[in-house]
């Protein structure tokens, strides 16, 4: 008798559910995708015990026809695909027909639905099978209640993280869905406490204000761009709002949130020297394209995709982000001590603290990304974000919105300054929208003005510890890192100086020796002609070694061997020779070594000359490594610090 047997349907469904339903957040994601595909304009999510006890998703979409109810919990039953060719033209978020079957295999599911002009129906399912179906009163749309998740798979239940972690996962999913569908009103309630509430205005920056706070929202820069294949639109935050991990990078393709290492890299490259190593931006980017150019049928979670013409899209993202910051004023303001303000908010609203970067309540990271670079440090020490409790006994929307806006403003330091840019009394959604619109007007004015000098005029006051220059003008005080300032000046000088291609080489009396493994040698040999074209002639020397007898004259003598090593490593990683990138790295290296260091005292006229040179730079706000050069203190901030203004 043979050993191979066909699995029972219930067991096969549980195995398949392991890929689709990893945690409570997976259930929320699948149900939200179904609601959005049903053209819902309002979606309410209610969870108990972080989704372990129950998850309820109510939408006002098209609903499910009575004749379709008998198939709704069958695996691979869907209304979104009909033939093979449809798989290459997917515009819906769901398409596999696995979600409800997988959920009902590991939970108890009650589904109530009603289509336009028809009577409502209710069905109840366990273990993937419908146990009851009956008529029921229902509004147009679908109401799904998922209870006792993993009740029949205790091994899965024990791998569920803490309630705060799971709540964080759910909040993250809703946040991203709200960003990609700003025209939909989302409400997330956890144990009767409202955590997220969007107004469905259709403005992505308003949703981002709810998630990240008004301070970040005011510093969002709109980007847009087109090629023959792609339409790109999004918002990128100024570099001063950078974070310690990639979690705050949100990329969407045709409204679908995805994870893609190459596109993440393009975004970071777009910021270029505006970010320090290990810092990543807050941004939202949506790319519209013909579905035939993207394969979303890679993994059941639908987070991974394969892209056609990926390099073209990479270049578009880099270009548009660089253009966005080209003429912006990027001097960061000093933040006042946030501890006092946080404590004040806690006293007033008695909130439950959920750490923003520890993946608890608001905008937490996905814990199981497929690229290691997307993982979030559990112990990240960046700023916290407080979720909102209703502040009145009747839980009215007005009270909630007022409390929410006050919390967001206090936590993000969004208080009134001398220019009147911040209004601590603007606690309604309407006021927030007006502030965002005003900020966008300022951006448009700046773009039209395009000033040549982006650093304002300032007078030197003195120097601190031979490291920082103190300067002032009528608006306030400035601190300048003298090493970073001269590093930027020399970087742009060397970058331009070595920017012209030359075939002149420096011959060596004693050749340089380089060692590479066999697999690396195969790649080097493949690209040897390209290396020769840029003046790097690698000659085999033994079984694993190469020698170099000359190098281009623009290589700094002291760093020539290091530059050649970096050049070859770049080829090994990227499978191409990028002379522009190599020359830039050389310029960074030279500028750092030749700039004045800390504890070097300067005369006043030397400091003034340094500032004047900095004002002429193309990008005067960060050194080539991304560290800030200038920090400003407005007159208002100084008066607040000394309690002259309360």
UniProtKB/Swiss-Prot annotation:
Disulfide bonds: none
Transmembrane segments: none
Pfam families, sorted: DNA_mis_repair, HATPase_c_3, MutL_C
GO CC terms in record: mismatch repair complex
GO biological process, one term: mismatch repair
Low complexity bias locations: 424-436
Keyword vocabulary terms for this entry: DNA damage, DNA repair
Source organism, top-level taxon: Bacteria
InterPro entries: DNA_mismatch_repair_CS (IPR014762), DNA_mismatch_repair_MutL (IPR020667), DNA_mismatch_S5_2-like (IPR013507), HATPase_C_sf (IPR036890), MutL/Mlh/PMS (IPR002099), MutL/Mlh/Pms-like (IPR038973), MutL_C (IPR014790), MutL_C_dimsub (IPR042120)
One GO MF term attached to the UniProt entry: mismatched DNA binding
Region described as Disordered: 356-380, 415-452
Matching HAMAP family: DNA_mis_repair
Free-text function comment from the UniProt entry: This protein is involved in the repair of mismatches in DNA. It is required for dam-dependent methyl-directed DNA mismatch repair. May act as a 'molecular matchmaker', a protein that promotes the formation of a stable complex between two or more DNA-binding proteins in an ATP-dependent manner without itself being part of a final effector complex.
Family named by the database record: Belongs to the DNA mismatch repair MutL/HexB family.
PANTHER family xrefs: DNA MISMATCH REPAIR PROTEIN MLH, PMS, MUTL, DNA MISMATCH REPAIR PROTEIN MLH1
Descriptive protein name: DNA mismatch repair protein MutL
Organism expressing this protein natively: Staphylococcus carnosus (strain TM300)
Lineage: Bacteria, Bacillati, Bacillota, Bacilli, Bacillales
GN (gene name): mutL
């Amino acid at each position: 008798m043979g050993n191979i047997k066909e699995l029972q349907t219930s067991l096969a469904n549980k195995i398949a559910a392991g890929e689709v339903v990893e945690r409570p957040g997976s259930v929320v994601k699948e149900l939200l995708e179904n609601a959005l595909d049903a053209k819902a304009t309002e979606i309410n999510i209610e969870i108990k015990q972080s989704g372990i006890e129950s998850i309820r998703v109510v939408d006002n979409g098209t609903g499910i026809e009575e004749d379709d109810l008998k198939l709704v919990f069958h695996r691979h039953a869907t209304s979104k695909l009909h033939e093979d060719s449809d798989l290459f033209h997917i515009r819906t978020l769901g398409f596999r027909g696995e979600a409800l079957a997988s959920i009902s295999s590991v939970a108890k599911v009650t589904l109530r639905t009603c289509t336009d002009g028809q009577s409502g129906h209710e069905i109840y399912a366990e273990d993937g099978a419908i146990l009851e179906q009956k008529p029921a009163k229902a509004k147009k749309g679908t109401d799904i209640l998922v209870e006792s998740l993993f009740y029949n798979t205790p091994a899965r239940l024990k791998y569920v993280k803490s309630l705060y972690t799971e709540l964080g996962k759910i909040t993250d999913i809703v946040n991203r869905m709200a960003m990609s569908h700003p025209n939909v009103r989302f409400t997330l309630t956890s144990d009767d406490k409202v955590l997220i509430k969007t107004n469905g205005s259709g403005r992505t920056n308003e949703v981002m204000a709810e998630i990240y706070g008004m301070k970040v929202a005011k510093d969002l820069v709109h980007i847009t761009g087109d090629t023959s294949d792609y339409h790109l639109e999004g918002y990128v935050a100024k570099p001063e709002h950078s974070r310690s991990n990639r979690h705050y990078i949100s990329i969407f393709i045709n409204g679908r949130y995805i994870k893609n290492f190459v596109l993440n890299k393009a975004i970071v490259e777009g910021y270029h020297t505006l970010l320090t190593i290990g810092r990543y931006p807050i941004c939202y980017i949506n790319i519209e394209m013909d579905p035939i150019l993207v394969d979303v049928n890679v993994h059941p979670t639908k987070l991974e995709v394969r892209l056609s013409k990926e390099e073209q899209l990479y270049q578009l993202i880099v270009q548009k982000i660089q253009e966005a910051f080209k003429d912006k004023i990027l001097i960061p303001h000093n933040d006042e001590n946030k501890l006092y303000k946080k404590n004040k908010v806690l006293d007033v609203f008695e909130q439950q603290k959920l750490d923003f970067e520890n993946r608890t309540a608001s905008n937490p990271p996905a814990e199981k990304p497929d690229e290691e670079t997307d993982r979030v440090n559990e112990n990240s020490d960046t700023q916290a974000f407080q979720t909102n409790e209703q502040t009145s006994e009747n839980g009215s929307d007005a009270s909630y919105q007022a409390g929410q806006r006050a919390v967001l403003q206090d936590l993000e330091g969004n208080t009134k300054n001398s220019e009147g840019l911040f209004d601590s009394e603007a606690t309604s959604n309407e006021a927030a929208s007006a502030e965002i619109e005003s900020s966008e007007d300022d951006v448009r004015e700046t773009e039209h003005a395009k000033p040549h000098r982006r650093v304002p005029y300032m007078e030197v006051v003195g120097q601190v510890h031979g490291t920082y220059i103190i300067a002032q003008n009528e608006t306030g005080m400035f601190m300048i890192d003298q090493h970073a300032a001269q590093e930027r000046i020399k970087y742009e000088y060397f970058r331009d100086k070595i920017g012209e291609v030359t075939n002149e080489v420096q011959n060596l009396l004693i050749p340089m020796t380089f060692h590479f493994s066999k697999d690396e040698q195969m790649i080097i040999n493949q690209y040897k002609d390209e290396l020769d074209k840029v003046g790097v002639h690698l000659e085999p020397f033994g079984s694993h070694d190469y020698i170099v007898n000359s190098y281009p004259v623009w290589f700094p003598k002291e760093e020539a061997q290091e530059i050649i090593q970096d050049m070859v490593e770049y080829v090994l990683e990227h499978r191409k020779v990028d002379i522009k990138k190599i020359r830039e790295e050389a310029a960074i290296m030279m500028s750092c070594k030749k700039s004045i260091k800390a504890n070097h005292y300067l005369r006043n006229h030397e400091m003034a000359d340094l500032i004047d040179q900095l004002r002429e730079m193309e990008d005067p706000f960060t050194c080539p490594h991304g560290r800030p050069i200038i920090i400003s203190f407005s007159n208002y901030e100084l008066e607040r610090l000394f309690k002259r203004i309360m």
